Curated annotation (Swiss-Prot):
Origin species: Brucella canis (strain ATCC 23365 / NCTC 10854 / RM-666)
Keyword annotations: Ribonucleoprotein, Ribosomal protein, RNA-binding, rRNA-binding
HAMAP family: Ribosomal_bS18 (MF_00270)
Role, per record: Binds as a heterodimer with protein bS6 to the central domain of the 16S rRNA, where it helps stabilize the platform of the 30S subunit.
Name this protein carries in UniProt: Small ribosomal subunit protein bS18
Keyword rRNA-binding: yes
Lineage, uppermost ranks: Bacteria, Pseudomonadati, Pseudomonadota, Alphaproteobacteria, Hyphomicrobiales
Organism superkingdom: Bacteria
Alphabetized GO MF terms: small ribosomal subunit rRNA binding; structural constituent of ribosome
Length: 82
């Protein structure tokens, strides 16, 4: 009979924690006029992509959302994409 304690166990898989793309020395600044940068954080339907997907820190996600909303209000970005 096989002893359970003698079966080799696998090490658990550790996913590397993503770092915030807006943190660091030469990171881009979040600006409502930088439409190209803001479009990377908007889904194809026009919704703001959550930080758990984009790996943006909580503070920078709030800044990003504010910049996207400001750009929408000024007509630089669409509210909804059909």
């Amino acid at each position: 009979m096989v002893d359970i304690n003698q079966i080799p166990t696998r090490r658990p898989f550790h996913r590397r924690r993503k770092t915030c793309p807006f943190s660091g020395a030469n990171a881009p600044k979040i600006d409502y006029k930088d439409v190209k940068l803001l479009q990377r954080y908007i889904s194809e339907r026009g919704k703001i992509v959550p930080s758990r997907i984009t790996a943006v820190s909580q503070k920078k996600q709030r800044e990003l959302a504010k910049a996207i909303k400001r750009a929408r209000f000024l007509g630089l970005l669409p509210y909804v994409v059909k």
